[in-house]
């Protein structure tokens, strides 16, 4: 069920055509052209990153968790994993991975899930669904609330129990760890730098992340 294929990237951050540090709790939306590479770097360690993707040719064809899991016969993602859309279309391939534990089942925290899982007073805490909604409200892309679907939680440690349930455990990432993926189609990336304080997925201390596109040659070729 679980196999970690650790691989370092051949690309250098100093060659990036784009980089941005995102503070804890914020959302981020960015277009990635086919052939470009995208890296998420965990600056301080143990930070969960709620992420989903959309096919820019058909934004309704968003990342599909079931299609991705079934095609690779594995619930976890690592080097070589193909992230697929609902149609089955390959959107991205993970080309480098330094943690090997990326959740495909836990989904994004929300006001409703915080209330059910933790306590009624938690309903007012900022959450990943809020971050997603704020990004969608500002985008000019044809992506709406209806297009939110189960997402990937990069760096998030969600073991499956013997009974078939799942739990949120301490993260396995560390400062400087990263995951890198190459776009197999033109995609829109939607991210929430998870603000969760009620479970150990962020070590109860949400922190900053670095997003880069360290692929100048591919970028130039796609323009």
Regions found by a protein language model. Name each.
Residues 69-154:
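Low-complexity, serine/threonine/proline-enriched polar segments
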């Amino acid at each position: 069920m679980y196999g970690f294929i650790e691989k370092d990237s051949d690309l250098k951050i100093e060659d990036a055509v784009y980089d941005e540090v995102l503070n804890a709790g914020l959302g981020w939306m960015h277009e990635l052209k086919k052939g470009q590479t995208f890296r998420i770097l965990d600056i301080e360690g143990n930070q969960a990153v709620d992420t989903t993707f959309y096919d820019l040719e058909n934004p309704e064809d968003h990342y599909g968790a079931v299609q991705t899991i079934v095609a690779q016969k594995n619930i976890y993602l690592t080097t070589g994993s193909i992230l697929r859309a609902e149609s089955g279309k390959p959107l991205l391939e993970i080309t480098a991975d330094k943690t090997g534990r990326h959740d495909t089942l836990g989904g994004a925290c929300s006001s409703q899930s915080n209330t059910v899982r933790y306590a009624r007073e938690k309903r007012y805490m900022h959450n990943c669904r809020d971050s997603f909604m704020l990004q969608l409200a500002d985008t000019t892309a044809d992506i709406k609330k209806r297009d939110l679907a189960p997402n990937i939680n990069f760096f998030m440690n969600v073991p499956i129990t013997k009974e078939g349930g799942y739990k949120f455990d301490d993260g396995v990432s560390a400062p400087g760890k990263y995951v890198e993926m190459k776009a197999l189609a033109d995609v829109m990336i939607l991210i929430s730098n998870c603000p969760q304080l009620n479970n150990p997925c962020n070590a109860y201390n949400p922190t900053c992340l670095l997003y880069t596109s360290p692929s100048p040659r591919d970028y130039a070729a796609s323009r």
